[in-house]
Amino acid sequence: MTTMGEDEAPALPKKSPLPEKIDEADVDDDPDDKVIKIVVVGDGASGKTSICQRFAKESFDKSYHQTLGLDFFSRRITLPHEMQVLVQVWDIGGQSIAGEMIDKYLTGANIVFLVYDVTNSKSFENAVDWLSVVKKNTKSSETPVKLVLMGNKTDLEERRVVSVEAHKNFATSNDMMPTYVSAKTGDTVFLTFRQAVAEVLNVGLSRAEVEADIEIVQGSVIEQPKQSDASYARRSDQSRSTSVCSIT
């Protein structure tokens, strides 16, 4: 399997298999904070690291960075009733599917994001293998692990090769939360993280809160490429197939 990025790049120095230290956001842990561990898996080049960076740092890096083993991100978010949650994100390199550390990476996960590239059919086909690995290594978890199927690169709608129907059917048949994101534009990235965390903690998000997350992204986009009618129709269908948690 390849690793994330649009172009090939020289191999980078190998990282330690587990993080030696955590992000600065964890240094001043509040004992009252809830802590949620999200593990992000999927083929290389599907955009996993870009999604994590968009969530944790609200940025998008166009340059290629190969993930070897594991990258670690974290961010505090606020849910209704002033609930503070520390979200720890484990970004797993695409080559790790056959690695001996994959079980360690998945240990203690509350949520798993299975990411694929909507413009790459192979990354979607390989989702079956990734899901099998995830289920094998989380079956003994004390609490059920929430599974999320995440189609990335929706900003490249005109190059889509994985249909909305295939995405929805795969998610439904495997009891997964279906969602689409664009790491490049930020479209629904933060919302998806927030929804998944809220569902795990049994916290409902109001319609106003969901729409506020969407508006933040839309307000940051200066220019959107003009879409054909067919592209717009696919985009509308895609939006309807994206899960929205407990809107009251």
Curated annotation (Swiss-Prot):
Disruption phenotype: No visible phenotype, with seemingly normal ciliary structure, and normal transport and function of IFT proteins such as osm-6. SUPFAM superfamilies: P-loop containing nucleoside triphosphate hydrolases. Transmembrane segments: none annotated. Residues 239-248 have a biased composition (Polar residues). InterPro entries: P-loop_NTPase (IPR027417), Small_GTP-bd (IPR005225), Small_GTPase (IPR001806). One of its GO terms (cellular component) is periciliary membrane compartment. Residues 1-30, 227-248 are annotated as: Disordered. Keywords: Cell membrane, Cell projection, Cilium, Cytoplasm, Cytoskeleton, GTP-binding, Membrane, Nucleotide-binding, Transport. Its main location: membrane. Changing Q95L: Expected to give rise to a constitutively active GTP-bound state. Cilia-related sensory abnormalities, but undergoes intraflagellar transport, but at a reduced frequency compared to wild-type. One of its GO terms (biological process) is intracellular protein transport. The keyword DNA repair does not apply. PROSITE patterns: RAB (PS51419). It is a peripheral membrane protein. Gene3D superfamilies: P-loop containing nucleotide triphosphate hydrolases. SMART domains: RAB (SM00175), RAN (SM00176), RAS (SM00173), RHO (SM00174). A motif (Effector region) lies at residues 64-72. GO terms for molecular function: GTP binding; GTPase activity. It is found in: Cell projection, Cilium membrane; Perikaryon; Cytoplasm, Cytoskeleton, Cilium axoneme. Changing T49N: Expected to give rise to an inactive GDP-bound state. Cilia-related sensory abnormalities and failure to undergo intraflagellar transport. CDD domains: Rab28. Expressed in amphid and phasmid ciliated sensory neurons. GTP binds at residues 42-50, 91-95, 152-155, 182-184. GTPase. Intraflagellar transport (IFT) cargo that undergoes bidirectional IFT along the ciliary axoneme when in active GTP-bound state in amphid and phasmid ciliated sensory neurons. Targeting and function as IFT cargo may depend on the BBSome, an IFT cargo adapter. Does not undergo IFT when in inactive GDP-bound state. May in turn play a role in cilium structure and/or function in ciliated sensory neurons. This is Ras-related protein Rab-28. The lineage of its organism: Eukaryota, Metazoa, Ecdysozoa, Nematoda, Chromadorea.
